Structure formats: C-alpha cells, structure tokens
Swiss-Prot record:
Listed Acidic residues bias regions: 244-257
Comp. bias intervals (Polar residues): 281-290
Signal peptide region: 1-32
Domain of life: Eukaryota
The keyword Signal is annotated on this UniProt entry: yes
Family according to the record: Belongs to the NPY family.
Species of origin: Drosophila pseudoobscura pseudoobscura
Protein name according to UniProt: Short neuropeptide F
Prosequence residues removed at maturation: 33-87, 138-290
Keyword flag Signal: yes
Primary localization: secreted
GO BP, sorted A to Z: neuropeptide signaling pathway; regulation of multicellular organism growth; regulation of response to food
Subcellular compartments: Secreted
MF annotations from Gene Ontology: neuropeptide hormone activity
Length: 290
C-alpha cells in the first residue's frame, strides 16, 4: 500500500513552481515586442536593441505628435526636445491678458500708435505749462465729439473778444463816463447805532422860529413838553420852591441818594471762607457739664 509522505509533496510543489517560472522567462522576449507601455496618454512600443530605428510605428503613430501635444499643454517647466533645445511658453502682457486664459481681440485694434520725434526713440513729454488741468482737452488735438456746451463756450468767447475790441477802440471816449462808476456813493444813514433815530427836521433850517416850530410839531418833543408841564403843576413841586435854598439842596441830596448803590456787608465769602467774626450767640451741640 502507498503511503503519503508530506516532505515529498512539498518538494514536488517547489519543482513545479520552478518549472513554471522558467517557462515564463523563456516566453517573455517574444511577448515584449507586442506589449505596449503606457507613457502619459500615448502607447509607445518597446523595441529590442537589434530592431532598426523607425519613426513611424504601427501602434503609437509618429513620435513628433508627443512633443506637439506637450507644447499645447501648460506645464510650469520648459519643454525639452531630443536635441537638447529648450522652448518656453511666451508670456503675454498683463494689459492684454484676460482671466481664465482668454485673449481680448479688440485690444489689438485699439492700440494707439505712439508719436515719435524723428529717429530718436523718445516719447513726447509735455511740459507743465502745456498740460491742462481738471480734465480739459488740448485744443491742438482733434475733438472726438462736439457737444452743445462746446458751441456755447465758443460763442461766449467770440462775444467777449468783440466787446474787448470795441472797448479798446473807444477807451478815450468812455473814460469820463466810467470814472464816476467807481466812486462810492455817500448815503444818509437809515438808522443810527444803539437805537437812536434820525431827526425828522432838516438841518438846513436857519431861522429859530422854523426850528422851534419843527421841534414843536414832532411828537417826541410834544410828549417831553407835556411831561414837563405836568411836573411843574404838581403841588409838591410848588411847596418845594416856596422853601429856602437850604431845604432845596437837602431835598436834592435826598433825591440823589436813590441813585447811589447801597454797600452791603457780604453774607458769605467765596470758597467757603468766613468773615472771621465770632457770632453773637454761641450755639453748641454738646451739653455743658454740671
């Protein structure tokens, strides 16, 4: 009877594996001619060393397409050709560059040609005296659009120039007329300061009777005279004139005392100070001891 030996089975398995590996190694060169290798997006075949070089292959097409495709891509680094030539992508000007890789076709048509002076490669620099401020246009440059405001300004300028020419021709004739315009006209005051009013009578009155009549006709003078008459007709006024001169002076002194300012003692000083005098009645919150 046949007995199963585990060591023999392991040895057979190892022998079979080695045979399979040898068979695979023998068939690998023949299959390499037909197995493409993926490089990027193109399938490039791996040819043996003894195969003659050929630019046209049956699988990947011409190899120049690979470099054309690389040139169309936006790589950060330069593209290196087989002959060690380096080609970089052209940098576009920021003024012509749009967002998201777009180009502006209108910018090429709207580029203004620079003005050059002869053979000197120098841009014209306008001096400050010729530079116009506040957005005004240069009269030497052609106007792009003419508006009604421009016509109005031109009409006003022509009228001003004509008037100046006429004034220049007849300056001697109008000098006498224009001298009086610059003299200041002296007018009578409509009102005086501090509430005073202008007298109603004329200052050219030379006769005293006319002056007296004008004062009498004025209402202010009439009121003053009426008040004086009432004051003289009062009984106290008559009794005062009947007394002696001393009594009259004493009465006048008493009357003037009303207009004198009364000098009072200070009730308190500033900043909490006291007058320094002791009060007449001392008050104490502490009860005296018996």
């Amino acid at each position: 009877m046949f007995r199963f030996n585990p060591q023999l089975s392991h040895g057979c398995a190892l022998a079979l594996i080695c045979c399979l590996l040898n068979l695979l190694m023998m068939h690998q060169p023949t299959n390499a001619e037909l197995s493409p290798v993926v490089q990027g997006e193109f399938f490039l075949p791996i040819l043996p060393d003894d195969h003659p070089p050929n630019t046209d292959t049956s699988f990947g097409g011409p190899i120049s397409n690979l470099y054309d495709n690389l040139l169309q891509r936006e790589y950060a680094g330069p593209v290196v050709f087989p002959n060690h030539q380096v080609e970089r992508k052209a940098q576009r000007s920021p003024s012509l560059r749009l967002r998201f890789g777009r180009s502006d076709p209108d910018m090429l048509n709207n580029i203004v040609e620079k003005r050059w002076f002869g053979d000197v490669n120098q841009k014209p620099i306008r001096s400050p005296s010729l530079r116009l401020r506040f957005g005004r246009r240069d009269p030497t440059l052609p106007q792009m659009r003419r508006t009604a405001y421009d016509d109005l300004l031109e009409r006003e300028l022509t009228l001003n120039n004509q008037q100046q020419q006429q004034l220049g021709d007849t300056a001697d004739d109008l000098s006498a007329d224009y001298d009086g315009l610059y003299e200041r006209v002296v007018r009578k005051p409509q009102r005086l300061r501090w509430g005073r009013s202008v007298p109603q009578f004329e200052a050219t009155i030379g006769d005293n009777d006319q002056l007296y009549n004008s004062l009498w006709n004025s209402e202010k003078m009439r009121r003053m005279l009426l008040a004086l008459q009432q004051y003289e007709a009062a009984p106290g006024h008559v009794a005062g004139y009947a007394n002696d001169g001393d009594d009259t002076e004493a009465q006048l002194d008493e009357d003037t005392s009303e207009f004198q300012r009364e000098a009072r003692k200070p009730m308190r000083l500033r900043w909490g100070r006291s007058t320094g005098k002791a009060p007449q009645i001392e008050t104490s919150s502490i009860a005296p001891k018996n």
